[in-house]
Amino acid sequence: MKYSVTLLPGDGIGPEVSKAMVRAVDFVTGGRIDWEPVVAGSTAVDQGLSPLPDEAIDSIRRNRIAIKGPLQTPVAGGWRSVNVLLRQSLELFACVRPVRSLPGNTLARYQGVDQIIVRENTEGLYSGREHEVVDGVVEALKIVTRDASRRIMQFAFEYARSHGRKKLTIVHKASITPLSDNLFLDCARECERNYPFFQVEYLPLDNLALDLATDPTRFDMLVMGNLDGDLISDLCAGLVGGLGVVPGANYGEGCAVFEAVHGTAPDIAGRDLANPIALILSAELMLRYVGEAEAADHLRAGVERLLVAGKSLTRDLGGRANTSELTDALLAELDAVAGEADGAAPRPARGPAHRQPDNTP
């Protein structure tokens, strides 16, 4: 069957990495995805639209699946983060970032890292509630609610169960913000009682930072609030080679948006130099979400073979290839994977045998 997927190419290097991702996904699915491109971010603003046009939101709500490249957020005003607006508009309450040491990635500082970071995505300091109290004094509010905390904990424990995880680490700073963080922890403890087969630990944020620097392999799944999750997920990406090899996903009720978590890199935009691996691995998550496990396995195998070969990598991965050359090399690896699976000479992938009866995740 075919799937309709909203595609937000993004800003800066976004269109280049999105093009590479589409080529790879079309290969492993046999072209069974109908891509519906829409604009957002500075690309939309340049066209006289809002940073997050209604057309983009309507498309995602209709298709219930989207994947996006990086979107620009002005640092000194202009408009609010489109990423935050997107999450809040669609109630994408759970951000999930798998962080793994990939075979052949020589830039990874640690081997054997395999952890899932789950981040509450809708409140905390990202609620956008700040104001100037008096001249020279600004107040920002950290909003934490029982409903949102329960929801992310239920999601995290269920995600751990369905993905074969054994240990959850609930991250907090209750010694400094006791009311908000203890509410978060109370919801975790309530949920923990329903999942006695998990090992659960409660770890202060500063302890986590130290432990990640010394032995990140001891962690299986990390669950935390919005700001903490944003910072720690980027830190963890640095442990395994950087944001260019780490995928991202945002989940809501019956809706999901997959994304590269790196920036727009305007200094190399339009120069065919960008690394598309992060967005391609995000597409792997997307394929698993819709039940296309065989296509997802095919895509991951191709990426891992590409990294192990080490011949056609972009500069941030230690090579000299451009985006197009990396993508061509990846398609060759995907072709080889398909040939080995069939026990014959390499040939184009036919798409997975598993079919989902409808477009419902």
Regions found by a protein language model. Name each.
Residues 11-14, 64, 118, 156, ...:
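Buried hydrophobic positions in well-ordered alpha/beta secondary-structure cores of metabolic enzymes
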Residues 32-55, 210-212:
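N-terminal beta-loop-helix "entrance" segment that forms/cooperates
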Residues 42-45, 211-314:
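Glycine-rich phosphate/nucleotide-binding loop
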Residues 21, 25, 188, 279-287, ...:
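Buried hydrophobic packing segments
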Residues 128-133, 137-170, 174-177, 195, ...:
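Glycine-rich phosphate/pyrophosphate-binding loop and the adjoining helix
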Residues 45-139, 227:
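N-terminal glycine-rich phosphate/adenylate-binding segment common to multiple enzyme folds
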Residues 6-28, 134-206, 218:
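Glycine-rich phosphate/diphosphate-binding loop of Rossmann-like nucleotide-binding domains
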Residues 1-5:
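Extreme N-terminal starter segment of soluble prokaryotic enzymes
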